[in-house]
Amino acid sequence: MLLSWGGGESRRPVQEASSATDTDTNSQEDPADTASVRSLSLSAGHTKHIAFLFDSTLTAFLMMGNLSPVQSTGEREAQRYFEHALTLRNTTLFLRHNKDLVVQTAQPDQPNYGFPLDLLRCESLLGLDPATGSRVLNKNYTLLVSMAPLTNEIRPVSSCTPQHIGPAIPEVSSVWFKQYIYVYHITGQGPPSLLLSKGTRPRKLPDIFQSYDRLLITSWGHDPGVVPTSNVLTMLNDALTHSAVLIQEHGLHGIGETVHVPFPFDETELQEDSCQYGCS
């Protein structure tokens, strides 16, 4: 799927569907490559675009398809989706036809309109074999920008040419890369956390988690999930046969609250928060 804001003055996205980008292909032949490139061809000359890479979760955010039926939880999720939608809008407006991004490459005898912007879904792009995908990106794009964080199940596109801004591997967006336990130890703050290595067989829930109603469970290569304490032991023993597992508390009496902070930060709010934490 390709969403393009490149042509004319219209701001409406134009969706192009192609079997070459939505299905897997193992062919290394030129016809397949030509079809792939043609599906992403540019309408005006050969001006390269900026590609914004996203995964299928972005569609769910914009459609609000994952809202909880519980009113209190649904309101928090709706606020989260709204903030992410605003961040996407601001990112799109900044990247699309931004003259400041092409100052060094602009020709003095040619008008500077900035680069057009395309939204590329990672699942479709990764359906191409690596060689074909690399040729498509090099032919059509001057810069790749990844949505962050991408879902852990999706391996994002990594590229040196064109330059890529964003997480190069899924582990960059994972709890393991962020090293939560180390940060909690240094700052002296954070929820009770326990990292269990693969193959561990706990016979009972550790005492530190006995008083909590729900726990946040994160295993390697998967997004975290909230599990009731009453049946977490069975799930833990099953997950530990495949990977290491990080256990964190998520609600002392009821459902815990997770705060999602969209980037970029608002400078005024950032200064207020810094003052608040510094004075507390």
UniProtKB/Swiss-Prot annotation:
Region of interest: Disordered: 1-36
Ranges of compositional bias, category Polar residues: 16-29
InterPro entries in alphabetical order: FAM91 (IPR039199), FAM91_C_dom (IPR028097)
Protein name: Putative uncharacterized protein encoded by LINC00869
Pfam family, one: FAM91_C
Signal peptide positions on this chain: none
Organism: Homo sapiens
Annotated family: Belongs to the FAM91 family.
